[in-house]
Amino acid sequence: MSWTQKTLGEIVNLKRGFDLPSSNRVDGPYPVFSSSGQTGTHSEAAVKGPCVITGRYGTIGQVFYSDAACWPLNTSLYSTEFKGNDPKFVYYLLKTLPWRDYLTASAVPGINRNHVHLCPVCVPDYETQTAISGVLGLLDNKIELNTKLNGYLEELLLAKYDKLFPVNADFTGILSDVGTIIGGATPSKKRSEYYCSNGIGWITPRDLSNTSDKFIAHGTDDITDEGYASCSAKLLPKGSVLFSSRAPIGYIAIAADAVTTNQGFKSIVPKKEIGTAFVYCFLVRNKHRIADMGAGTTFPEVSGKMMKSIELAIPEQALCSEFDFFAGPILKQQEALERENRELAALRDALLPKLMSGEIDVSQVDLTQINSHFVAQLVFRA
């Protein structure tokens, strides 16, 4: 295994993406990529695959890969020229670059491709490149498979809900009949002792915007016991359904453990005889109706009073029990798959810089022998 020092421009040729006004887009088979990832599809492709894409303006530092033909937008840099290198290896290599070091000093900072082409990189022989991308690709493929399975389980769950609880059923009660609606609060940001990294889970709408996970136990910041006592935040039990009531309205998640939230939520603690699954599915199916209740103001928000008064058809106990029996295993499987994905992502992110630098010899990596202790060691050393 040999490694050679080169510049980025010697292994890939980044180019500016293509204009495509939204008014000219026609849904089709080809993915459209902006600086923040896929943003829809188009009936035509601008380039053939494989293709790597990263941000030129806007979101900087994220890197995307398309095996198929696609359309990189003008906010991105892309390349289909890999100069004899493994395209997937180049994709992972780009993920390790210090992109922000190459931002232009202008009113709207962006990446100048001529500057970033001078970035020094160290690359191995082609055989080692494919071995590295193979290991990292296996982890990404498993994450993708788990995500697709979770999506399928979500479809099953909502289809069963729709069958048992039709949308045209007569209203017989309000949301507060099926659970307790609880708001949140924020400890003073001026008191650093109120916040920590391993305390009481404290969730904000931004935390939900940064994840596609259905279950959540911690956000960016946790709060301390002192921080919790300093404000009116309430501890929501595991299984509570979090619903963002402003900025924006309609993010939904399930508490994987006891959590608190900031004031951007009106969360529901379901009654035992109703269950988490029913409340979750009701909110998913009615989030646009709820959002409309908060519209028409300068700062759209759904108040606690509004939330409590949302009309619904109170489920019969027999139907509720049937749905809970069906939904319980699905929720457990979804939570387990999300947990596995976080572990796989942690492993991938720990391996990535070490494989790319040659610190870890890829020929010595056996994914079948990797356990949580190995992952913990990698993360600690990272």
Feature map (PLM): residue ranges:
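DNA target-recognition domains and sequence-specific DNA-contacting regions of bacterial/archaeal
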Residues: 2-123, 173-315, 363-382
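Non-catalytic DNA-recognition/assembly elements of restriction-modification systems
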Residues: 1-34, 120-186, 197, 313, ...
